[in-house]
């Protein structure tokens, strides 16, 4: 295919309050669109209409996973299927379950809702009660970006540390970069007292092409998905992820705008090429938007890259000027010791990389559990808002590794539940380990879509982890 056949787009976007009006012209055809809000479902509808009118790719959100017809449904037990408080808006994503002498406590992501991190309680894992929020509206730490549809609060997790409860979490800073915070309380329901500053703030990058200005929200990236693991001897470890998977799409779009000949080198399908051309054109407008709007505008380009993952990385790896893009496509899991007062001590180590094809441009959501004398890390991979998102597992003989991955996901999308991810492990009522995780209802996905809480039993040996994948057939996954 000759490059001149990839006709360019002309785009005129205009902000209209919370809505966006976009006029798109290509090859003599003009269409006008209105995106009513910054929510992901409205952007997904826009991209579907764009695909209908201009032949770009349809968004993966809403596309059913590929599942063989005779594949039995897994033995995943739904625990929470509705918001248990009118102030909880998107369910219970990134669920962290802690078993205490007073039953089970759950904390979960709240995204950009005014009240950060719902706290739930259950005695039997069946009936759950909303017990408040870690940071109710107006009480979030001063170092975080705050306000309705402004702040972002993700992936909280409680741990019992001595006589206190600690909560590590992710919050967006006023610069737009994500950071990890630490709060402490005498009880899982609080009151929670933040330490007053980020515990970790790193890997923030200016990708907005708007110039460096510390007073402006131009940064992307940062750190996310923190997890505290306490070993049998009382040693404390903090795990987290370098969050650069949202960093590379707009620089890639900028590179394609500057060097349009790369589009045909990266993509073979016409729909993907047109998608890349559109992303290249809308890029400057995307730079002016809030982080999750940027993400939504670039989502189809990201999906085109993931569908051509190995080839795209190979081409970009040999392309001058793409070094930062390629580096940002790696989202390593880090780990470091924690002192008794919550300070980071010792060496920061990378313990896991997204180096398997199914993981695509990211791994995240680490959770370590000690079973059968070994350390098992559960993690999520691929795009959280699509059915490609899955749960993987790796094993090591020390909390800091080296970890050996299994080659295939432990849990992946089914006909009944899409995008299982960000798991935690806690003893069930029988004392045996259970995996707790979130998933979307079929046909749903993306930022602020409802995520349900599910669970499934786990069985460990020295060399394998077994989940009751089907109601009557255990599936054993042996480590490579």
Q: What are the language-model segments listed below?
A:
Residues 2-480:
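Carbohydrate-active catalytic/glycan-binding domains of CAZyme proteins
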């Amino acid at each position: 295919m000759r490059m001149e056949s990839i006709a360019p787009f002309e785009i005129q976007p205009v902000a209209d309050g919370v809505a966006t009006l976009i006029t798109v012209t290509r090859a003599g055809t003009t269409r006008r669109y209105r995106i009513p809000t910054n929510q992901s479902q409205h952007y997904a509808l826009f991209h579907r209409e764009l695909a209908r009118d201009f032949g770009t790719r349809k968004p993966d959100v809403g596309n059913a996973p590929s599942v063989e017809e005779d594949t039995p449904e897994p033995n995943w037990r739904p625990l929470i299927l509705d918001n248990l408080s009118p102030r909880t808006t998107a369910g219970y994503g990134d669920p962290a379950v802690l078993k205490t002498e007073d039953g089970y406590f759950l904390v979960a992501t709240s995204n950009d809702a005014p009240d950060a991190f719902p706290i739930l309680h259950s005695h039997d894992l069946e009936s759950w009660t909303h017990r408040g929020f870690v940071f109710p509206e107006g009480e979030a730490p001063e170092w975080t970006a705050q306000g309705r549809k402004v702040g972002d609060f993700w992936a909280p997790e409680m741990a019992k540390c001595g006589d206190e409860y600690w909560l590590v979490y992710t919050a967006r800073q006023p610069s737009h970069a994500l950071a990890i915070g630490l709060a402490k309380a005498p009880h899982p329901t609080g009151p929670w007292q933040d330490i007053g500053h980020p515990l970790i703030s790193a890997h923030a990058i200016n990708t907005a092409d708007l110039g460096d200005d510390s007073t402006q929200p131009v940064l992307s990236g940062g750190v996310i998905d923190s997890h505290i693991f306490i070993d049998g001897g009382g040693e404390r470890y903090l795990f987290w992820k370098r969050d650069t998977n949202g960093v590379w799409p707009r620089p890639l779009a900028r590179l394609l705008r500057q060097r349009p000949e790369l589009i045909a080198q990266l993509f073979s399908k016409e729909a993907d090429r047109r998608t890349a051309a559109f992303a290249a054109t809308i890029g400057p407008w995307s730079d002016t938007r809030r982080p999750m709007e940027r993400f939504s505008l670039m989502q189809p380009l990201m999906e085109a890259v993931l569908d051509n993952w190995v080839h795209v990385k190979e081409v970009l790896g040999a392309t001058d000027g793409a070094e930062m893009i390629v580096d940002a496509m790696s989202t390593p899991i880090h780990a470091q010791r924690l002192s008794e007062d919550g300070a980071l001590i010792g060496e920061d180590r990378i313990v896991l990389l997204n180096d398997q094809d199914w993981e695509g441009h990211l791994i995240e959501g680490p959770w370590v559990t000690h079973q059968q004398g070994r350390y098992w890390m559960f993690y999520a991979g691929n795009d959280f808002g699509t059915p490609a998102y899955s749960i993987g597992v790796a094993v090591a003989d020390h909390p800091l590794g080296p970890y050996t991955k299994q080659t295939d996901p432990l849990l992946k999308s089914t006909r009944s539940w899409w995008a299982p991810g960000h798991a935690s492990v806690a003893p069930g009522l029988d004392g045996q380990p259970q995996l707790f995780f979130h998933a979307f209802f079929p046909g749903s996905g993306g930022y602020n879509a409802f995520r349900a809480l599910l669970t499934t039993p786990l069985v460990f040996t020295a060399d394998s982890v077994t989940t009751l994948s089907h109601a009557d057939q255990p599936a054993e996954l042996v480590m490579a």
